[in-house]
Amino acid sequence: MAGAPPTDVEECTLETARRELGSYAVPVDRTDRIPLSVAVGRVPATDTTANNRIPGADIGVDDTVFERGHQLRPADVGLLKAAGVSELLVRQRPQVAIVPTGDGVVEYDAGPEERVETAGFTLAQYADRWGGKVTYRNAVADDAPALRMAVQRDLTRDIVVLTGTEPGDTLRAVVRELGDTVTDRVAISPGRETGLAVVQNRPVLLLPESPVAARVGAVQLLRPLLKGFGDAPFSAHPTREATLDGALDTDRAVRSFVPVALDGETATPLSGTDLATATRADGWVTVPDGEANPGAGDTVSVEDWDYLP
């Protein structure tokens, strides 16, 4: 990125963050030829044409069944089988490295002054579901040489995601030395400490350690980035209407995402930024910046962030 690097107090909107990251999301040109039996969720690299006529479906030989960029569903592969298609040329899934960072972070069996790493591990599962080919790394201690090696190691991937970081820490300084920092903060809550950088033309997403904040940052930034690299359609999460049984308390200066538990048509706001809060959430309510908080009895739209794709 051109220009002087921003200070750790600079902040960008979510729309700006998406635009900056999206400018690097050139669809991968790597392809695989795969059997139809494992094609669900994949994105054809070329138009898919019929080898056989399908009676009653108005599809003849050499007709286009699905255009390039269509993400295949289970019913789609059934139609392709009827059209005599047995294998497909698909785009390879974009490669994403997820690297947890921080002192005292372990994979299992945390001792005194240690904690089990969960934010990066959870994000790895989401990234896989969103179409990424994930490399999940062991946690890297808060040591500049070790962090530098960790970032450089994964620059062969399309995207690098680092968790456990905040403005002004050792990792942010290392990333600034290696490349260009776009911003140290994004105007979202939770997750305002989310940072963006570019190192050797690779987008780098810097997420907080909090499971809820990391999840918000990943859903809002990593998911659309993966779809861009994969040339896959980016669809909105499904929503349902619900009535709040308690008022929301958010910062009007930023766009807020509030986890809620659903009981029928009633939504109960959940407090906290720990793993249990993220797990108990049945959906999320978005409160745009500048808008008043919805109160008890108000009807809100609840997004299902666990919906596939």
Task: Please describe what each predicted stretch is.
Residues G41, D63, A75-D76, P94, ...:
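Structural beta-strand/beta-sheet cores of well-ordered domains, especially the beta-sheet scaffolds
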Residues D103-G104, E166-P167, E209-V212, D249, ...:
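Short, glycine-/Ser/Thr-/acidic-enriched flexible segments
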Residues A4, A45, I54, G60, ...:
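C-terminal terminal segments
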Residues A2-R33, R42-N138, A267-T268, W284-V285, ...:
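Short, glycine/charged-enriched hinge/interface segments at domain edges or termini
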